[in-house]
Amino acid sequence: MDTPQKSITQIGTPISKSRFEDSPVFNYINSLSPIRPVRSIPNPNQFSSLNFTSPPSVFTSPHLTSSHKESRFFKTHNSSSSDPTNSVESQEDESTSHEEVPAEGEDTKGLNIDDCMREEASVETNLDDSVASPCGGNTTDLSLVPYAPTRGEDGSCEDNGMELQKMHDNVQGKTETPDWESLIADASELLIFDSPDASEAFRCFMMQRASNSEARFRNGVEKQTMQHDSNKEPESANAIPYEAVSLLHRGIRRRCLDFEMPGNKQTSSENNTAACESSSRCVVPSIGLHLNAILMSSKDCKTNVTQDYSCSANIQVGLQRSISTLQDSLDQTENEIREDADQDVPVEPALQELNLSSPKKKRVKLDSGEGESCKRCNCKKSKCLKLYCECFAAGVYCIEPCSCIDCFNKPIHEDVVLATRKQIESRNPLAFAPKVIRNSDSVQETGDDASKTPASARHKRGCNCKKSNCLKKYCECYQGGVGCSINCRCEGCKNAFGRKDGSSIDMEAEQEEENETSEKSRTAKSQQNTEVLMRKDMSSALPTTPTPIYRPELVQLPFSSSKNRMPPPQSLLGGGSSSGIFNSQYLRKPDISLSQSRIEKSFETVAVDGAEQMPEILIHSPIPNIKSVSPNGKRVSPPHMESSSSGSILGRRNGGRKLILQSIPSFPSLTPQH
């Protein structure tokens, strides 16, 4: 291909439309359209400067100049949406590329190859700058304004130039503002956080202070914007440095993109008035939610915000002063409300209303029987005109707490209520009297004093208890805390407050009698217990098999031989083992009884001094009341004793058989042994 040589040889010669469209240079220029690369770059989230750069220092003074700060906010707001500079550039190049074709259709008034090559070089330079920028083509060089072709036929290029001039003037006007104040003015949207609660709280706090000066502020905005637009000077030759723009995006993208709410971003079509209104929403310098408290804690925290570029208004906000004035106003209003309440509402009714909810007050009202408190009736068919309606019986009207249906016990039906009361009183004069009547107010129905209940009060109708003995809550007398009276028809009354058939003295006497009877029963039981113990001891002292008792007529027992006779008792006492038997047979009372062991030990002494030691009771006749019922006594027969000169103890029978008696175990005696 030798197209470059042809283009060089044909420089300065006019060419036709068909030859120019077929030239490779025209095709190459059309392929280098800047619209596609510029529109594919403006996504700010694809760069990692937000993640890898450290946040700026908070407590140190701002390091960037005022122009850098203002440009930083301007660039960041437009980076997420459509960049105004990129749009201007794209419109410029697009208008250039589109206007060349109709110009060639008109045989292009003096257009040559040098103009096309110059335009190609400018497009390449602009593309390289946009690609080399780390912020996605946001650093547009404003020096491209002179290269924009101006055509007045359709006005498209002139409109683009005016838009670019307005944007540049806006940037230049922002650079003239002070450092800290302009940072606050353009950082108004930084205080719109993702959290709706935080934004709402901050908005409520600031709108109280700024609501008064909002009207004056807008009036100043309208006046100053007109003067500011008339005093503008075109400074399109100045350009923003590349390093400054890159630093702007590094420093501000971290705060705006993460904390800014969508829909509240500035666009390139906003005018100066809208910008002034948006910046006037926040006039307080702020660092962050967690550092605002440190900034506001200073005593003399005042900020002078001067907005020269938009309205040249001077707003002075004192945080501590505004808070103190707000607190003073609140205290003043509270004091006024208290004074009004003290003057209008008396103290005693208020205290009574507060005391209505206390249980003691309710209890006193219920006990007093006065119809002051409504008991919240629940009538459905009686229309609250019967005695079982507690409100009607108490003489009060039904109020809101009552859940009655079709109620006539209200002030609007006063005539019906009074007529019903008179009709009921004509039949029973005490119908509407209190249930519990005190002694001072009670009237004796009979002349006897005994008819009066000894308790402090009595029930007007009385109870009708049958099985509860007036000791349960459904007894009206017991429930009212009064004793039963003669009017009561109860049975087996045991009312603790007073019985209907007696006085309190009788009740005390009955209680004393009950106590005495209980004591007597206790003593009787103790005596019975002692007697039982004594009987047990006596029964244990007697032998298990008592021997038969001999009477005087039985002293001479019949024997087989009439010659043999029983020896006298003196001879019997001298015997060995048999003497114990007869001795035990003669014992009649426990106080003179002797144990068998002791008798066995003193056999010899008894034999010697038998006549002297014999008790008199043994000589006399025995007691005939004791009878022998032991079968052993019937079988045992006394042995035949033969008198012998030797005085032998053992006797012999005729048959030569000996009587062998087993030893009887000894039993303890009841009397002490000496």
UniProtKB/Swiss-Prot annotation:
SMART domains: CXC (SM01114). The keyword Ribonucleoprotein does not apply. It comes from the Eukaryota. One of its GO terms (cellular component) is nucleus. Residues 507-516 have a biased composition (Acidic residues). One of its GO terms (molecular function) is metal ion binding. Ubiquitous but expressed mostly in all the aerial organs with highest expression in flowers. GO terms for biological process: regulation of DNA-templated transcription; stomatal complex patterning; stomatal lineage progression. Residues 1-16, 76-89 have a biased composition (Polar residues). Disruption phenotype: No visible phenotype. Residues 1-20, 69-113, 504-529, 623-655 are annotated as: Disordered. Its main location: nucleus. Pfam families: TCR. It is found in: Nucleus. Keywords: Developmental protein, Metal-binding, Nucleus, Zinc. Plays a role in development of both male and female reproductive tissues. The cysteine-rich domain CRC binds zinc in vitro. PANTHER family: PROTEIN TESMIN/TSO1-LIKE CXC 2, PROTEIN TESMIN_TSO1-LIKE CXC 2. This is Protein tesmin/TSO1-like CXC 2.
